[in-house]
């Protein structure tokens, strides 16, 4: 599924028959379900890669808003350094039985209006007010998903 939400197509990947995965689109997870799951999740896992391709996975707090994922990190952390050289990223929720996986690219979010709104969102969701006044200490990344994978049961 792509995140052009109004024009998203639902495609069922091929599974081995022995897995008995339903081929009925009514049984597939809906975008509404995935969107709600992404919005309500507290801890997300991200995977980045170094310039040499070495993978790195880390848990982060984040905000899902308007089909974008936002998170903060220290620019000198492994994930911060990786993203400064390689913008490719994978984001997924913790629940392995009801999984939403995003693949895309991450760029620094610098729009003051968006950062002000995200600060409020962090406070509401985590009872935490971030300080993004100095990008040498914390940077906010915006993830633009290209591919969204949904796995599991919508009733999980």
Show the residue positions of the predicted features.
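Amphipathic alpha-helical interface surfaces
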Residues: 34, 79, 114-118
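Short, conserved active-site entrance elements at the starts or edges of catalytic domains
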Residues: 17-55
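Short, intrinsically disordered, mixed-charge
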Residues: 84-89, 120, 124
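Short beta-strand segments
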Residues: 41-75, 81-83, 89-93, 101-103
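Charged, gly/pro-rich active-site loop segments
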Residues: 2-29, 98-156
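Generic structural signal for secondary-structure transition and capping sites
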Residues: 42-43, 88, 127, 148
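A generic secondary-structure signal marking the coil-to-beta-strand transition
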Residues: 34, 42, 67, 98, ...
